[in-house]
Amino acid sequence: MHGEHDRGGVIIKVCDDVLALAGKHERAINLTKLDNTLEQHTPMMRQYLGIKAQYPDMLVFYRMGDFYELFHDDAEKASRLLGITLTKRGSSNGEPIRMAGVPYHAAEQYLAKLAKLGEAVAICEQVGDPAKSKGPVERQVTRILTPGTLTDAALLDDTRDNLLLAIAHGEGVLGLARINLASGRFILSEITPGLLAQELERISPAEILYPDDFYHMALEQVKCPKKRLAPWQFDLDSSIQTLTKQFSTYDLDGFGCAHMLAAIMAAGALLDYVKHTQRTSLPHIQSLMVEQGSQFIQLDAATRRNLEIDQTLRGESSPTLYSLLNTTVTAMGARLLRSWLHHPLQHQADIQARLQAVKVLQAQYDGLRPLLRNVGDIERMAARVALKTARPRDLSGLRDSLQQLPALQRVLRPEDSALLHSLQQQLDVPQAALDMLIAAIKDEPAAVLREGGVIADGFDAELDELRAIQSNCGEFLLQFEAQERERSGISNLKVEYNSVHGFYIEISRAQSENVPAEYRRRQTLKNVERYITPELKTFEDKVLSANERALAREKFLFDELLGNLQPALAAWQRNAEAVAQLDVLATFAERADVLKYVAPQFSSEAGLDIVDGRHPVVEQLAQPFIANSVSLSPYRQLLLITGPNMGGKSTYMRQTALIVLLAHCGCFVPAKSARIGPIDRIFTRIGASDDLAGGRSTFMVEMTETANILHNATERSLVLLDEIGRGTSTFDGLSLAWAVARQLLEKNRSYTLFATHYFELTRISEEFKHAANVHLDAVEHGDGIVFLHNVEEGPASQSYGLQVAQLAGIPRTVVNAAKRKLVQLEQSQVMQQSLAGQGDMFVAANVEPEPATHPVVSELESIDPDSLTPRQALDVLYKLKKLI
């Protein structure tokens, strides 16, 4: 914003794009109010308040010399969030000015902290020349940082995509548009409103935009920052115009999204928002991608959580599937691996292409990975070039990375992999741009442009001449010093420089009477005098001028270079994509060799057959790991899994789902063999957790997740259910578990692994021929239990709950009391069932009533001899005698 003084007032000019984002009517009112009060403030505060009015919901970092200052409410908020000092200095409009500031050179660390906290920041720089300014130096907002529009390397996680998402509502659908500003990837999709929570979990946006007249419960549950925009910013006609202008097309038919009206509205609002924050035309955003739900296996929020894809149930990053597989050697590969794990492919042709590439790379990854390791983050460096926010070391890093690609092309042998052949072609480097980078940028440039030392020698004649003046400075000063010593006869005369007084001749106080007449005193100290001569002054002006002009010339050349590199952006994006895919595929090959994984086989026939499958993460933590097989088909749809706690039921179910997921990502799997038919979704209901924030009990969460499965699972879905019904009374829980299993068998007809401790439920295989029983084996050893962890056909004989309780450290007296109570309950149950003519196959087969325990024995079992005093021991003896 520029402030102009006119008849004592202030005219505030506001760019059209700002008006478009904030609402013309509302903004006009705000500016009118501001216009009427600005004259009561100091000139500098008038300028600040005018800028702040444009960004009322952002922290404004206002550049003043070597600091970014924040004022008033911004200062208080920044002080609280950043732990910086809040002060009061001077006054404006009769009130003290509240201030807080951060050093300019250390600003990035504070910006990074604010970004993590979800705050938006407007960076206001000095753009005018202080020497030519009559009032406050002209300032403009040059950069806006919001959580979803970060591109600076210091503000981003190398292993995660940073996504900005916009949501628009249409007739019965929601339009989603998301953009990764650091890569230029722009993706549209449409979903039914009921799938929004699932999509937010999958996309995991850093920031969400949505119209002010839209509400959905899922928005309350997501933790990222959210920004409401005026509904008119999602106008369909305006959005179409914004998008066609960006892509220089007549319409959107070529992108396959012309019929996706809600998604187009979201995309238009999103693109306008990004243009506003970045203050550029976004040249690296060159296309739209339409994402169809059928492209990927659907994983709901519960499934992503329960499978611990990249976060444990405790919220930690390790041990997870991602942490196990992530031996990638590039930042781009690390991000792509995470994305692939969250987006398993559904189309078998695409999966087979990846698997074939992995197979080919098993013989090549040793030669490829050292070259890949030398490739920097081309994707994000190229994005910063596009946005013209690149720093000198972005360009040197880009240059060094691009120089690795020809060698990578030569070493890669695609053989019979069409995917690898395509990636090899994508590694073609735009040579003209690379030559420009090689010629223009020093081998090791300065970190920031203002320090100089960025543009290579020989690139620009004018810059070379200015540098020559500076480099010859030392030689001139030596000659001048020798000349003046000889001319003055003062042998200890020195010529020196400091940043305050510039160049000077230093002479001791005792010899100051002998100086030549043309010496002019510059500074007097205790023991020395400092002088300047016309010749030295002329040289000083020349050197200092050369330094300033050299820095200005370097900035001009650097900015010009960024402009000249724009045509290479599309090619660099292809390079980045190829490197990322090669890195992940080579990682899959390396992991397959090291971890002894095999290639899965895909079939058009329904079913799932895994021989000696292993849990990829657990097998690395527990050795030896017992492998187990699983077989599901249209004739064996539901496996009812029984067995003791800690026997491995949950591990068995999770490993089945993870093997299916890995296979659909194009990765080899931990098994002896795996044949997988068509799968469209994976559902899980495992573990117990409540939702206190949402006001839902553990049982309510369980039932909600189960309802989602029953409503959405198909005959091509894989369903994992663990302990359904345990959060309520025994009969309620058993009834619910039976009804859920029946629904899955009769209606959904999904492939289901159903773990339970309700032994009565095992009879369901007698009623439904497509259900079968398996169990995790265990054997008793003395008073304890040994878990065998192997899966056997048929139901378990007992749960071994008391033995597990003993292993957990439950006091022996409690365990013994439980055993006695168990006998009573089992006797009662057998009697009731016998009277009804319905004996339980488990109870009837296993109940062997123990004789009643003598009171003396019970008392002795409760005694801890080591803790008794002599007096207490005597009392116990008297008590025992009475019990006989």
From Swiss-Prot:
Signal peptide: none
UniProt keyword annotation of ATP-binding present: yes
Example of a GO MF term: mismatched DNA binding
Keyword annotations of the record: ATP-binding, DNA damage, DNA repair, DNA-binding, Nucleotide-binding
TM region positions: none
UniProt binding sites for ATP: 643-650
Gene Ontology process terms (BP): mismatch repair
A GO CC annotation given for this chain: cytosol
PROSITE patterns in the record: DNA_MISMATCH_REPAIR_2 (PS00486)
CDD domains to which the protein is assigned, alphabetical: ABC_MutS1
The family this protein is said to belong to: Belongs to the DNA mismatch repair MutS family.
General function of this protein: This protein is involved in the repair of mismatches in DNA. It is possible that it carries out the mismatch recognition step. This protein has a weak ATPase activity.
Protein name: DNA mismatch repair protein MutS
Organism this protein belongs to: Methylobacillus flagellatus (strain ATCC 51484 / DSM 6875 / VKM B-1610 / KT)
Record lineage: Bacteria, Pseudomonadati, Pseudomonadota, Betaproteobacteria, Nitrosomonadales
